[in-house]
Design a protein with these regions (language model features):
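C-terminal compact regulatory domains
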Residues: 1-129
Length: 129
């Protein structure tokens, strides 16, 4: 899949994890923006032009605002892309109940950590055809 020029918002509070994700995604041709917590992600999304972000990749466990609350906040915004932008969350907890909580928050995909970049890129490609 050609991921060139897709714009992804990566939300991760761990600096090393964020750097690794950005490096890998940029190497795959994606255009990457970053936020360090859910609140910052919501604010960036609100300020962006509609459909500016093709996809959001977000950690669940973050200070200030976690990934689930951020996803709910984004889904609740009154703009055309708020309900359609694919949101993928990353979590060390991939139990059925966690995945259900993600679905309830309007999240499209729940990926387990540690991150396998090949898998992440496949998932991104599946949403951004």
């Amino acid at each position: 899949a050609d991921l060139t020029d897709l714009h992804i918002l990566v939300v991760e509070d761990n600096e090393l994890n964020l750097e690794i994700a950005v490096f890998s995604l940029e190497a795959a041709g994606l255009n990457v923006s970053t936020a360090i917590n859910g609140l910052e992600a919501v604010q960036l999304f609100e300020k962006s032009k509609p459909y500016e972000y093709d996809i959001i990749l977000m950690d669940i466990m973050m200070p200030v605002m976690n990934g689930l609350d951020a996803a709910k906040a984004i889904r609740g915004l009154s703009r055309p892309d708020a309900t359609t932008v694919p949101i993928i969350v990353l979590s060390a907890n991939a139990f059925a109940e966690d995945i259900q909580k993600s679905k309830n928050a309007g999240i499209n995909e729940h990926l387990a950590k540690p991150l396998e970049m090949d898998k992440v890129l496949k998932v991104i490609a599946s949403y951004c055809k």
